[in-house]
């Protein structure tokens, strides 16, 4: 067991994922060649460098994704075939009130999640991004989202899980357990903001929210 080395629980009053809020002196890889990449193609690598995100298909076997999804249904005491169970209150209390109603599932260390984290293709993808085999797993929760009920005003929100001013920069991965298209799924990003962050931030007020950017005027750039 590792001792808590975060002084005075300094993450208590800020949003985001504490496991990505700080990192070591290791910086993300800056260059690569086809023969040094394990999972990414050189085209995917160039896309990653240009747009700040990349999609790795079939990162885990479909059967394993289904087992994980079935576990989440069971953990939340909901039935995929019974819509009446979908919108019942979550089982666990959400400490981060801004996440209430967003489908977050308060499970972190179940073996299904660890099986996914330790898949060779998942590991190798991060080796490609970081440029090192010495990786430390960040721990995060799962998500079980449903179609928004009629009359709901909630909209997904673009956010960072750590302050982008953190240097060296960090990186996260999101594992989709079901097929997604333009109209479904929980992940959104703004590649334009990735490419233009340093100039964009100069247009923002000094007291801007470092975790939830003002995306006014960027709506057409969300993917």
State where each predicted segment sits:
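Non-heme Fe(II)-dependent double-stranded beta-helix
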Residues: 2-50, 57-165
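Ligand-binding pocket scaffold of soluble enzyme catalytic domains
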Residues: 40, 73, 154-158, 177, ...
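Short, conserved beta-strand element in jelly-roll/cupin
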Residues: 163-182
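Double-stranded beta-helix
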Residues: 180-223
